Structures are given as C-alpha cells and as structure tokens.
Design a protein with these regions (language model features):
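Hydrophobic, well-ordered secondary-structure elements that form the walls
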Residues: 2, 53, 63, 113, ...
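Short acidic alpha-helix that forms the nucleotide-activated donor recognition element
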Residues: 39-48
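Acidic donor-binding loop of glycosyltransferase active sites
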Residues: 47-60
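C-terminal alpha-helical cap of glycosyltransferases
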Residues: 143-161
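Catalytic donor nucleotide-activated moiety binding site of glycosyltransferases and closely related
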Residues: 1-38
Length: 161
C-alpha cells in the first residue's frame, strides 16, 4: 500500500496544480491513498506506514521517532531560479544541521532510492542506530518517564519561588 501525503502548498498554489494532478492520477490504483488537504495530522499515517520516502521534510524526524525507517531523497531538482542563483536556496536551508538528514538512507538518484526502499522493507532495523541517535539528540531520554520528570521539575521550580 502507498500513502501519499503532499505538503499543503500542492493544494494551495496554482503553480503546483500539475504536481497535484500527477498524484491524483495514482489514486486509480486500489492500493494508493492520497491524503486530503484537511488531513493535517500525520500521526495516523506514521503508524500505518512501514517506510517513509520523503524530501527534506520535518515529518522524517517524527517518523524516525516512532522507530521506523525513512529515506530522504537528495536528488531534488531545484527551480530554475535556484539553479541560476544557488545561494538563494542555500540561504533557505540550515546546512549546519544537514547531519540530521542522515537519520536514514539519502539516495542521490532514483535507482538508489528503489534499492534503499527494498533494503529497508526487508530489514527495518537497517538504520536503527541512526534513528536512535537522532532521537536522543533531539528529544533526549526516551524512557516513558518524561511526565514524571516534568512534574518533578515544576515542583522544584515552585519550591524555589
């Protein structure tokens, strides 16, 4: 099964109409679901999926946080403006934190992406260490006791007032 969850700008901006129609054409297949514009909560999609294939979307971090493999495509084709003036895209990207995208495979072309998809579906633990490292880096300790720590910290802060 394939779940397509496009960014909201595909629904909102006229210049992406062709891209949206391309995704809509996939829905003729019974195993393809295209999320609607008002389906903004991605959690149901995260839990229903075995693998995420994405661009540089923050949803990758959420998906990795639930312990599932992700593929971050690095073979993006930038708009003509950004190809002519690459500094404009570099200015928009936080290149200092590019290491975060290494939470999963980062294919440089379509053939690599297909190979990575097969590998991750066969072996979901392939990049498990990378996902756990990212989770610790962004979230901290993941032990189910965060609520207790928050309460303890609030009580501590309250007693200091």
């Amino acid at each position: 099964n394939i779940i397509l969850k496009p960014h909201s700008h595909l629904f909102l901006r006229k210049k992406y109409t062709k891209d949206l129609h391309r995704l809509e054409s996939w829905t003729k297949y019974p195993n393809v679901y295209l999320a609607k514009f008002n389906e903004t909560n991605i959690l149901p999609f995260l839990h229903a999926s075995d693998l995420m294939i994405s661009d540089m979307s923050s949803a990758v971090f959420e998906f990795s946080g639930v312990g599932k493999p992700a593929i971050i495509n690095m073979f993006l084709r930038y708009r003509l403006l950004h190809r002519i003036f690459p500094h404009k895209i570099t200015k928009r990207l936080d290149t200092a934190n590019f290491f975060l995208w290494e939470v999963g495979d980062t294919p440089r072309n379509y053939a690599e992406m297909l190979q990575n998809a097969k590998e991750n579906l066969t072996n979901p633990d392939k990049n498990k260490e990378k996902r756990e490292k990212l989770s610790r880096h962004i979230v901290g300790i993941v032990d189910g006791k965060v609520s207790e720590r928050i309460v303890d910290k609030l009580l501590e802060l309250n007693s200091n007032i």
